[in-house]
Amino acid sequence: MKKQVVEVLVEGGKATPGPPLGPAIGPLGLNVKQVVDKINEATKEFAGMQVPVKIIVDPVTKQFEIEVGVPPTSQLIKKELGLEKGSGEPKHNIVGNLTMEQVIKIAKMKRNQMLALTLKAAAKEVIGTALSMGVTVEGKDPREVQREIDEGVYDELFEKAEKE
């Protein structure tokens, strides 16, 4: 029998046996508390953020493994800036400002899940998300910063980040 995969979105470090987890894994005959404990241990560094988690179960042996994904880019931006939520009116209401270093940090976290081939392209994706949330970058309109990236203004930062 092949393994079954259950995918859920849980709050980092705070998974509970209730929905969405309990109903999803209960029918598989697993010890729900054991699964919850393992998920909480694996996601504690993402406290306060919604984290995608895959539970891979062997229905015969009842063995399971946990794969923790990276939270959505918007969640990482909110955590970096200490925001509760993004702007309801991103064109008119600015809720925060990211530095280029913060953009690069988030891009490095998300890079494996992005279609971007370079760190620069990944950073531009993060900046696009910031734009839709009402977050400026380096105190400027995110579109302006994307143009500056294309012009090579931040090349030194990217080269340094690539080496880390």
From Swiss-Prot:
PROSITE patterns: RIBOSOMAL_L11. GO terms for molecular function: large ribosomal subunit rRNA binding; structural constituent of ribosome. The keyword Transcription regulation does not apply. Pfam families: Ribosomal_L11, Ribosomal_L11_N. The keyword Ribonucleoprotein applies. Keywords: Ribonucleoprotein, Ribosomal protein, RNA-binding, rRNA-binding. GO terms for biological process: translation. InterPro entries: Ribosomal_uL11, Ribosomal_uL11_C, Ribosomal_uL11_C_sf, Ribosomal_uL11_CS, Ribosomal_uL11_N, Ribosomal_uL11_N_sf. One of its GO terms (cellular component) is large ribosomal subunit. Belongs to the universal ribosomal protein uL11 family. Forms part of the ribosomal stalk which helps the ribosome interact with GTP-bound translation factors. Part of the ribosomal stalk of the 50S ribosomal subunit. Interacts with L10 and the large rRNA to form the base of the stalk. L10 forms an elongated spine to which L12 dimers bind in a sequential fashion forming a multimeric L10(L12)X complex. This is Large ribosomal subunit protein uL11. It comes from Pyrococcus abyssi (strain GE5 / Orsay). The lineage of its organism: Archaea, Methanobacteriati, Methanobacteriota, Thermococci, Thermococcales.
